[in-house]
């Protein structure tokens, strides 16, 4: 499943973060299963794929439409993560010591530099910016 990290405006696909652009205007993004109209929220580019994430005006579901060049490839459900859910995902992804070091660093408290370095390395491998992450865990 694709995860949309709303505070960072990033998708997480197969454990890797993908940056995108927010759609500023209210543009048509398809129809939802509930019968509502979906509006475009974000466009992401991953390798040769373009991914449109749309949100239903009626039930607030998010869907991703994946395109290869200009051809439609597939639909996928999108799990939306707010700040709290994203922090929980970080707790699950990083080890306990790494997460604790990250939080301590964000709060300008004393932290274990070895654990912090491991956390930073893991987040970098996921294509997530450490400074953005520190802002979220404060």
Swiss-Prot record:
Name of the protein: Uncharacterized protein AF_0631
Taxonomic placement: Archaea, Methanobacteriati, Methanobacteriota, Archaeoglobi, Archaeoglobales
Organism name: Archaeoglobus fulgidus (strain ATCC 49558 / DSM 4304 / JCM 9628 / NBRC 100126 / VC-16)
